Amino acid sequence: MPLYLDEHEHIPGLEAGALAQAHARDVEVGAGYGVNYLRYWFDEATGKVFCLVDAPSPEAAERVHREAHGLVADRLMEVTEGG
């Protein structure tokens, strides 16, 4: 399956605990769509978040974010994992 990296430019009031809950919800909802949210990185000060996701399509990845918590990414790009 393709691997995608998404970027959320600014999530107002971003907190580590709330983000961990949102990621857990992505994992839960994603199971029903064949989508696996693998990891995420964030900067609490700027509200910027990056998510790494294994999904059959960009639309499937977006659908999971929308259904899980409504925080849809500003950008989504297909990536290849390196060594």
Features from the language model and the residues they span:
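Short S/T/G/P-rich N-terminal loop/turn motif that feeds into the first structured element of a domain
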Residues: 1-32, 36-38, 42-47, 64, ...
